[in-house]
Amino acid sequence: MTSPVLKDPAKTRVIVGMSGGVDSSVSALLLIEQGYQVEGLFMKNWEEDDGTEYCTAREDLADAQAVCDRIGIKLHTANFAAEYWDNVFEHFLEEYKAGRTPNPDILCNREIKFKAFLDYALSLGADLIATGHYVRRRDTGALTELLKGLDPNKDQSYFLHAVGGQEIARTLFPVGELEKPEVRAIAEKHGLATAKKKDSTGICFIGERRFSDFLKQYLPAQPGDIETTEGEVIGRHHGLMYHTIGQRQGLGIGGLKDASDEPWYVLHKDLARNVLVVGQGNEHPWLFSRALLASDIFWVNPVDLGSPRQLTAKVRYRQSDQRCTLERTASGYRAVFDEPQRAVTPGQSVVFYDGEVCLGGGVIEAAEPWSPRA
């Protein structure tokens, strides 16, 4: 795929991914105001399995259609449920089966929104696509860089780190230069149906269901012991897949005899023994790591790592930038942090930045303890 040269908006056909939310609604409106030939596309990525419409797809489609009618553009629909199942959901299940905590939104962006949707839009004759993500792009000669969104509270570059520069070059991000209150104000000013709609949270295909109830439909639970760091068995877990590093709620071990009143946290998942290791206190030493190992690194554009490089990183969404040194290893990459990192979680993504430029990232394989463990 060759990167397009941005041309006269009046001669540029843009198809906007319309989610039924306020961000994509305002994105379409702004592009119209900038003079682009704009159309919308609503994509359905999950087939409801029991008629209860957990994903609210019907409501979202109605909202997207109402917005398109209001601003006077055509709305296409496309079903990418098969692609989502094959390229996102099956990987999601495999990761949980392996005892890790994946982030399906990152794969969804790479495989669905910036691949299946992009390819489909181009087949419809689009020159570019647009989304409501809070990120920006910068064209630098032959490359297109991915930049953080200007609103630090909404920046979504963490979720787009696995999208290639060529795909970014085919995409416009109209709200990336705005803050969320500005976006809602624009929507209200123009009477858009989504102006006051709540932002979607959580994973689409789970919706309002309890996560454990959803997961056990696909993966058999394997109960096991809950142990302290000293090896004392203090309870039972229903399955390691239901727990993540740093988790406090839902352990069912409060009020133990001779224990302090401090809350319990998940410190480690011993996959070999199917044991959940817990400890008390938000500052428990086992919660902190000095470094991590990462694999499946995906760079937005080529990155030279012939020698260790000083960068910043995020090990979770909305985390502040953390200074680190990134180096190649025989099996992947190692990031050593200047400060202790709390609850570094295998299966989640680490994303690297050089200033406001999102360079890319990868999957956390393991965390190195900040202090030695007995």
Curated annotation (Swiss-Prot):
GO terms for molecular function: ATP binding; tRNA binding; tRNA-uridine 2-sulfurtransferase activity. The keyword ATP-binding applies. It catalyses: S-sulfanyl-L-cysteinyl-[protein] + uridine(34) in tRNA + AH2 + ATP = 2-thiouridine(34) in tRNA + L-cysteinyl-[protein] + A + AMP + diphosphate + H(+). Residues 154-156, 316-317 are annotated as: Interaction with tRNA. The active site is at residues 108, 204. Pfam families: tRNA_Me_trans, tRNA_Me_trans_C, tRNA_Me_trans_M. GO terms for cellular component: cytoplasm. Residues 103-105 are annotated as: Interaction with target base in tRNA. It is found in: Cytoplasm. Keywords: ATP-binding, Cytoplasm, Disulfide bond, Nucleotide-binding, RNA-binding, Transferase, tRNA processing, tRNA-binding. Coiled coil: none annotated. One of its GO terms (biological process) is tRNA wobble position uridine thiolation. Its main location: cytoplasm. Disulfide bonds join 108-204. The record marks 133, 348 as: Interaction with tRNA. ATP binds at residues 17-24, 43, 132. Its EC number is 2.8.1.13. SUPFAM superfamilies: Adenine nucleotide alpha hydrolases-like. It comes from the Bacteria. Belongs to the MnmA/TRMU family. HAMAP family: tRNA_thiouridyl_MnmA (MF_00144). Catalyzes the 2-thiolation of uridine at the wobble position (U34) of tRNA, leading to the formation of s(2)U34. This is tRNA-specific 2-thiouridylase MnmA. The lineage of its organism: Bacteria, Pseudomonadati, Pseudomonadota, Gammaproteobacteria, Pseudomonadales. The gene is mnmA.
